[in-house]
Amino acid sequence: MIDSLTALQRWYESRCDGVWEHAHGIEVVTLDNPGWKVKLDGATSGKVIDLSIERDESDWISVRATSAEFAGYGGPGNLPELLALAVEWIDWRATNDEGRSDR
């Protein structure tokens, strides 16, 4: 089993074709509240996700994903959880994309 960063790296690399990467990609940034934002776009047939969990003021996640875009937000300690959810979105898409594999 590969870690989340490796899975995201492989997904990104599999998409890069000289054109795609100029308009799409992966974004991981810090928020000023504090927290994290993880965004992936440029996919097709992704799993729709609408998830919001607030455990406490600094331990929370909010994920909205469509078939084409994943947007996840979380507290300062929730980056690994957000990355794992992004990989789940990619893996679902890879196994439900009419036999096409992104790995």
Predicted regions and their residues:
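Negatively charged, low-complexity tracts enriched in Asp/Glu with abundant Ser/Thr
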Residues: 1-45
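Generic structural signal of hydrophobic/aromatic residues within well-ordered alpha-helices
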Residues: 8, 12, 49, 82-86
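A short, structured beta-strand/loop element
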Residues: 37-62
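Helix-rich interaction surfaces within compact, conserved domain-sized segments
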Residues: 54-101
